[in-house]
Amino acid sequence: GHYHLATVDNQRISKEFTRNMRTGIERTYEKAVENPFLHGIPYIWCSNNLTTAMLTQCRLYRETTGDETYAEMEAALRDWLFGCNPWGTSMIVELPLYGDYPSQPHSSLLNAGVGNTTGGLVDGPVYRSIFESLRGVNMTGIPGTPGQDYERFQPDLMVYHDAIHDYSTNEPTMDGTACLTYYLS
C-alpha cells in the first residue's frame, strides 16, 4: 500500500508514504551493514519471506524515487536467495539445476515420492536458539539420502539445513515464493 500511496498526485500524502518506505528500509540497512552478506533480516521463522519482502520494498522504493541508496542491499538480498549466504546454497528448490539447492524440502510430495516443490522458496535460516527449542526436527533425509546439515558452515547465530524433517528452515512457503515471483517478473 505504501508504494501506491507514494505515487499519488497529492504531494503531502506522497511524501509521507515515501518517507515510510525509506524509514523501514533504513532500519534494515542499519543492521545489514554489520553483516558480511549485507543481510539485515531477523532470523525468525520464514526469514526468507522477510528477505523477499524487503527485496521488493527496496525495488519499489528505487522505482518510485529514483534513489539508488539501497541498490546494493537490494542486490545482496536477491543474491542471498540464490546462494550468496553462509551455506553457499540457493534457497529455491531445484534452482539452479545441477547447483546446490534445497533437494530435500519438508514437503508431502517428496515424502510420498511423487515429486518435488520445484521453484518453491524455503523458509530460510532461523536463530540457533529457535531451532534448538523445536520438537520433532531432525536431520534424517529421504530414504537412501542423508540430509545436508551444512555443519561446517553453520554460523553461531543461525542455522539452515537441507533435510526433509527440518520444517523450520527447509519448508517451501507459498507466500514467500509468490513474493519472489513478483520481484523476478
Regions found by a protein language model. Give the residues of each.
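Aromatic (Trp/Tyr) and acidic
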Residues: 1-33, 41-185
